[in-house]
A protein has these predicted regions:
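Hydrophobic transmembrane alpha-helices and immediately adjacent juxtamembrane helices
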Residues: 1-142, 146-258
Length: 258
C-alpha cells in the first residue's frame, strides 16, 4: 500500500489540492449551487405540480428532481475544472505540474477530481435538502451510479479541455451560458421529450445531454424517453472521447508549453 502511494504521490498531492480548493470556499462552490437548484424544485415543483399532475406516471414535482440534480452536477463539474485549469495556466502553475514526473493520465485525473467532488457534494446536498418537499425513489441504483459516473467524467474532462483552450474568463462562461445551459434545458429537465411535437421531438434526440438526463432519470424513477442502454452508450462514448482529448493535451503539451 505504501509503495502504491509513493508511486502516485504526485496524483495524490494534485487531487488533494483540487479538493481543498473546493472545500475552502464551500459557501460559494457548494452551498450556493445547492440553494439555487433547490429554488427550482420549490418554485417549479410546488407551483406547477398542482397543474401538471403526472408525467410518465410520476408526479411532476418528483419528475423534475433527477434532471435538476443532473444539471447542477454537470455544471459544477465543468465550471470547477474549467476555472481551476484556466487559473493554473494564468498563474503559470500548470507549467510546473506538466513538467513534474507524472503521467498524462495522472495529471488529467488529478485536475479532474476537484470538479467530481464538488458535483457529488452538490448532488447529495440537493437531494437531502429536497427531502422535506419530495420523496425521490431510486429504482435502479446500479444504472444510476454508472450514469452519474459517466456524466461527471464527461463534464469534468470537458472543463479541463475548455480551461486549456480558453484565452479569457469569458470563454469559460460562454460555454456554460451558450452551450451547456441551453442543451440541458432542452434535454428534458422540466418535461418529457415525448410530449414535444415533430420536428422538435426528433431534434431533441441529437442533443447529447438528452441521453445523459434520461439515464439518470431512469436510475431514480425507472422511466426514460429512450432506451437506457442507448443513453449509457452515448454518454460513455462521449466521456471516453473527452478523457482521451484531455489526456492527449497533457501528453503532447499542446497549448501548455510557454
Amino acid at each position: 500500500m505504501s509503495s502504491l502511494v509513493a508511486r502516485h504521490r504526485g496524483l495524490l498531492a494534485l487531487s488533494t489540492r483540487e479538493t481543498h480548493r473546493v472545500l475552502k470556499l464551500w459557501t460559494q462552490t457548494v452551498a450556493a449551487p445547492i440553494l439555487s437548484s433547490f429554488l427550482f424544485i420549490a418554485v417549479f415543483g410546488l407551483s406547477l405540480g398542482g397543474r401538471i399532475k403526472h408525467i410518465d406516471g410520476v408526479p411532476y414535482e418528483i419528475f423534475i428532481v433527477p434532471g435538476l440534480v443532473t444539471m447542477a452536477m454537470i455544471q459544477a463539474a465543468y465550471g470547477n475544472n474549467s476555472a481551476s485549469v484556466f487559473q493554473a495556466r494564468f498563474d503559470r502553475y500548470l507549467n510546473d505540474v506538466v513538467a513534474a514526473p507524472m503521467r498524462s493520465w495522472e495529471v488529467n485525473l488529478g485536475l479532474s477530481i476537484g470538479g467530481v467532488v464538488r458535483a457529488l457534494l452538490i448532488g447529495g446536498g440537493l437531494l437531502l435538502l429536497s427531502l422535506p418537499l419530495v420523496d425521490v425513489p431510486v429504482h435502479h441504483p446500479l444504472e444510476l451510479m454508472v450514469a452519474v459516473a459517466l456524466a461527471l467524467t464527461l463534464f469534468a474532462s470537458f472543463g479541463v479541455v475548455v480551461g486549456i483552450y480558453a484565452t479569457s474568463w469569458d470563454h469559460t462562461a460562454f460555454v456554460t451560458n451558450i452551450v451547456i445551459l441551453p442543451l440541458t434545458f432542452l434535454g428534458g429537465v422540466f418535461y418529457s421529450v415525448d410530449l414535444l411535437p415533430s420536428p422538435w421531438h426528433e431534434i431533441s434526440h441529437v442533443n447529447p445531454i438528452f441521453y445523459l438526463l434520461n439515464a439518470v432519470r431512469y436510475g431514480f424513477l425507472g422511466t426514460s424517453d429512450v432506451s437506457v442502454a442507448l443513453s449509457l452508450a452515448v454518454t460513455g462514448v462521449l466521456a471516453a472521447a473527452m478523457v482521451a482529448w484531455s489526456s492527449w493535451l497533457f501528453r503532447t503539451g499542446h497549448r501548455l508549453k510557454p
